[in-house]
């Protein structure tokens, strides 16, 4: 009797923020397409956003560890965090011994460290992907024992110790590229504007955007505005709207199919997390970027400046963000459609439609070697 072929087992981990979760989820879903040969586990914290996203996909199995970010000050919290690190590493060792993964992939966030370190202890091949110009602390540490490192930005290489580094771009879902060869029509009467403050939302961006776009709509500008407020900021932002039933000004707590909104948008106002930038460029959308001012090593501003250099984006620092500044920037673009066309065309410099397939192929190759 012919024996059933053993399935390949993969551990994928990345957590807490969308910038870490979505690359991991994209890879996990791609691997799970071959259900006959692959079994995919996602390791994260059940209390965090990754659990809510992963549980929507029955083909993925979620394994939870109770671990989170490191306190930056010496305190009792730091002492307790150390115990959590030990316990989470032991739990990860248990998971690895139980399921025997062929390889492990981490996409950033403190939640990834116990699992990746456990993999190192048990001599499992490890690959990491980092999205930003300045890699996070976990990526810097894990790069010392990872077999492969995948990056979005060339500039990030200098921070990492691994000898096997490749610039792949960010792994984003294929939906962002579907029909991307269709050019946006910037000569249309009504321009579609999308405002999004990242997966967590951003109240400062919400406040300024609502004030500016209410004024522009009242002045007769032909715009359709969609604002992703973030769940926790939705009610507070809704209170700022003078006309809550205006079909041309829509607030949403969260947009599950953000690719559809980006494809329709002629301009996006957003934070500059690396994953958001990849999604923006994949859909050829001109952008006004407002970096999160408290990002580690100011990496969001560095990300935004990379896009600004090639004229596909305008970077406005949050400290300089006022209604007048944002209004002037938007009106200048509305009145200069050719500028929007050029910005849209220049996004191709950063658009990497093969990134997901390349990363998955390298990861599978790592497990086979």
Please describe what each predicted stretch is:
Residues 14-25, 203:
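A short, glycine/small-residue-rich beta-strand->loop->alpha-helix junction that serves as a flexible
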Residues 101-103, 263-278, 285-286:
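Acidic donor-binding loop of glycosyltransferase active sites
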Residues 48, 53-58, 177-268, 301-305, ...:
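Donor-nucleotide binding loops and adjacent catalytic segments primarily
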Residues 72-103, 121:
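An amphipathic, basic-hydrophobic alpha-helix
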């Amino acid at each position: 009797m012919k024996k059933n072929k053993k399935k390949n087992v993969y551990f994928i981990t990345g957590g807490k923020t969308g910038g870490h979760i979505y690359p991991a989820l994209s890879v996990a879903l791609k691997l799970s397409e071959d259900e006959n040969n692959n079994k995919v586990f996602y390791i994260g914290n059940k209390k965090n956003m990754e659990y809510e996203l992963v549980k929507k996909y029955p083909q993925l199995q979620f394994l939870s560890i109770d671990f989170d970010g490191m306190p930056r000050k010496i305190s009792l919290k730091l002492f307790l965090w150390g115990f959590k690190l030990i316990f989470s590493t032991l739990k990860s060792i248990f998971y690895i011994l139980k399921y025997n993964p062929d390889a492990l992939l981490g996409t950033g966030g403190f939640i990834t460290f116990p699992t990746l370190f456990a993999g190192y202890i048990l001599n499992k091949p490890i690959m990491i992907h980092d999205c930003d110009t300045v890699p996070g602390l976990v990526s810097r540490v894990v790069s010392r024992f990872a077999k492969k490192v995948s990056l979005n930005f060339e500039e990030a290489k200098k921070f990492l110790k691994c000898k096997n580094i490749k610039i792949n771009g960010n792994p984003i879902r294929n939906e962002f590229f579907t029909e991307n060869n269709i050019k946006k029509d910037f000569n249309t009467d009504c321009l579609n504007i999308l405002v999004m403050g990242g997966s967590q939302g951003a109240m400062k961006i919400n406040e300024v955007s609502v004030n500016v776009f209410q004024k522009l709509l009242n002045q007769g500008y032909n715009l359709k505005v969609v604002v992703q407020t973030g769940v926790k900021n939705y009610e507070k932002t809704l209170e700022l709207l003078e006309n809550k039933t205006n079909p041309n000004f829509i607030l949403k707590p969260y947009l599950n199919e953000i690719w559809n909104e980006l494809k329709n948008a002629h301009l996006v106002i957003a934070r500059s997390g690396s994953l958001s930038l990849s999604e923006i460029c994949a859909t050829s959308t001109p952008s006004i970027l407002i970096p999160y001012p408290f990002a580690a090593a100011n990496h969001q501003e560095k990300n935004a400046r990379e896009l600004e250099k090639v004229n596909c984006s305008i970077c406005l620092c949050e400290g300089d963000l006022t209604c007048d500044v944002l209004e002037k920037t938007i009106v200048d673009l509305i009145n200069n459609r050719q500028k929007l066309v050029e910005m849209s065309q220049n996004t191709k410099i950063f658009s990497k439609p093969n990134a997901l397939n390349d990363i998955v192929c390298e990861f599978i190759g790592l497990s086979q070697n």
